[in-house]
């Protein structure tokens, strides 16, 4: 999800961001960088991660509960929702340690259970199974 790769930029306005600065930044991102821009306020996760993190954690919880296998969770999302990859493969790509870090930050700010990292994720990170970057996560690389 680095900015150079994705077509989206989240334009975050703080309490002190002027309308002129936000408008100039949006114009630059759109016209010069060719990005689609969404505006949001300054909160953990902005828009994308506020939606993405609970989704990824829900997939981990499904596997942890024995509801479905890793492969079946990912297959269901790819085939059933037309996503380019499943949530567990995406978690491996992001890095399970990174996912945990983001989830912890969001949970600390909002205290909402949907942001709480599941025990399986904690155990995998503690074991060094961080996903693609370590060669092992939900999948072997």
PLM feature segments, named:
Residues 4-8, 55-56:
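N-terminal alpha-helical segment
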Residues 43-47:
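Conserved short loop/turn motifs at secondary-structure junctions
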Residues 18, 22, 48-52:
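Amphipathic, non-transmembrane alpha-helical scaffold segments
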Residues 50-57, 79:
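Short, residue-level hotspots on alpha-helical faces of the histone-fold
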Residues 9-13:
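Short beta-alpha connecting loops at secondary-structure transitions
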Residues 20-23, 27-42, 60-65, 70-141:
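NAD(P)-dependent Rossmann-like dehydrogenase/reductase catalytic/cofactor-binding core
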């Amino acid at each position: 999800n680095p900015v150079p790769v994705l077509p989206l930029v989240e334009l975050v306005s703080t309490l002190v961001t002027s309308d002129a600065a936000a408008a100039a930044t949006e114009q630059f991102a759109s016209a010069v960088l060719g990005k689609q821009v969404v505006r949001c306020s300054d909160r953990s996760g902005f828009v994308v991660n506020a939606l993405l993190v609970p989704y990824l954690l829900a997939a981990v919880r499904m596997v942890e509960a024995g509801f479905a296998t890793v492969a079946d969770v990912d297959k269901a999302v790819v085939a059933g929702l037309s996503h380019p990859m499943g949530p567990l493969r995406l978690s491996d790509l992001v890095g399970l340690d990174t996912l945990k870090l983001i989830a912890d930050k969001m949970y600390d700010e909002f205290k909402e259970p949907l942001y709480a990292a599941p025990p399986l994720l904690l155990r995998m990170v503690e074991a060094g199974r961080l996903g693609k970057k370590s060669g092992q996560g939900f999948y072997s690389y």
